[in-house]
């Protein structure tokens, strides 16, 4: 075999180390989940699956998305991911934004439950910061849950300041390595920003009651 042919037969490496391999696997998993969710939406719209089957599978895929998205380093939003990897999945993105199957109504009970969840996530994340949690892999999951909760409902009043301040730190942490730690100065500013967002959220809720 000639050297030229040998070079052609040589394995093409998609990663250089274990960390890059995990990132590649996580990206592939996220791509597969979104693709599956898009196909599920189309199948349900064409009556190829029952409502119960659709609901069960949709919840499962949304949960898989949440877990996988946390593991993908540097992914700031599902829209950016789909655009970067040329994945056309508008139905899947809409389902992820709403955080529920289309058959599950966003009734008052769900709204109140969602509000309570956001409040709890605000408090939990602020408590972690005040208890001197500084590692990115400890802080990011809680902040990601909060960020996604804020962005997956249309009926909870979200002031612009809430989204802006939370997104600022979500983007910052998602660009850092899991082993990194934020400085005490950054932690102080993060507490101030997230606390401000929390107060703005509560203010919007109070105005809604009146």
Curated annotation (Swiss-Prot):
Tissue: Expressed in embryos.
Subcellular location: Endosome
Molecular function via GO: protein-containing complex binding
Domain VPS28 N-terminal: 1-106
Pfam family, one: VPS28
A single Gene Ontology CC term: ESCRT I complex
One example of a Gene Ontology biological process annotation: receptor catabolic process
Keywords: Endosome, Protein transport, Transport
SUPFAM superfamilies the UniProt entry points to: Endosomal sorting complex assembly domain, VPS28 C-terminal domain-like
Gene3D superfamilies with a match to the protein in the record: 1.20.120.1130, 1.20.1440.200
Residues of the VPS28 C-terminal domain: 110-206
Known partners and oligomeric status: Component of the ESCRT-I complex (endosomal sorting complex required for transport I).
Family: Belongs to the VPS28 family.
Function: Component of the ESCRT-I complex, a regulator of vesicular trafficking process.
Protein name: Vacuolar protein sorting-associated protein 28 homolog
Organism expressing this protein natively: Caenorhabditis elegans
């Amino acid at each position: 075999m000639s050297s030229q042919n040998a070079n052609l037969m040589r394995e093409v490496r998609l990663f250089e180390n274990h960390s890059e391999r995990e990132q590649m696997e996580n990206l592939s998993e996220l791509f597969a989940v979104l693709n599956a969710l898009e196909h599920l939406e189309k199948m349900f719209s064409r009556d190829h699956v029952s409502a119960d089957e659709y609901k069960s599978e949709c919840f499962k895929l949304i949960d898989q998305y949440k877990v996988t998205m946390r593991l993908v380093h540097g992914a700031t939003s599902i829209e950016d991911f789909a655009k970067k990897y040329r994945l056309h999945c508008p139905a899947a993105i809409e389902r992820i934004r709403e955080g529920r199957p289309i058959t599950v109504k966003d009734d008052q009970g769900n709204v109140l439950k969602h509000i309570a969840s956001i409040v709890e996530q605000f408090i939990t994340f602020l408590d972690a910061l005040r208890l001197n949690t500084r590692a990115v892999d400890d802080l990011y999951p809680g902040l990601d849950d909060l960020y996604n909760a804020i962005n997956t409902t249309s009926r909870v009043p979200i002031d612009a300041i809430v989204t802006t301040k939370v997104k600022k730190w979500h983007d910052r942490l998602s660009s850092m390595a899991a082993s990194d730690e934020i400085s005490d100065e950054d932690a102080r500013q993060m507490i101030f920003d997230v606390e401000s967002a929390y107060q703005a959220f509560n203010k919007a809720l109070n105005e809604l009651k009146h």
